[in-house]
Amino acid sequence: MKQSDLNEILKKHKRWIKNEEGGEPANLQDADLRRADLQGADLRYADLRYANLQSADLQDADLQVANLRGANLRYADLQRADLQVANLQGANLQGANLLDANLDYSCFPLWCGSKGIKLDRRLFLQLLAHICAVEVDDEECKKTQEYLMPLAKQSHAAKWLFGEERGE
């Protein structure tokens, strides 16, 4: 997709977000957005299902509640992107940069499509907390959870997951 066409879609989407005349939601389903410049873009509620966003610049983008199901985000730069409540089911995040990204309440893929992603401490602890919050029936796994629990409780999600304040 040409950057000029993309910019027009983003303009209409912004109008739609603001409930202004002439606005319409961004439908970028199956779009070829490889290496697209989406830095700082407002893509809240956008349909990006199965979009090819490989190596796209999504730094500081607002992707809250965006549907990125099955999207190719390999090597995408998502630094400081807001992905709260985003649907990332089946998305390929291999090699993506998620430093300082907000993935709270998102559907994050825990499969090989997330291999090689770059996480900051906050996201790592959040994922660890979720791993420690699940019930397992294997004794070795339970012991591993117990060992990792002090670190997991440093997550900002600890109070919600474990019913207690964060450890420092």
Where are these regions (language model features)?
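Intrinsic low-complexity/IDR segments
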Residues: 1-35, 39, 45, 49-50, ...
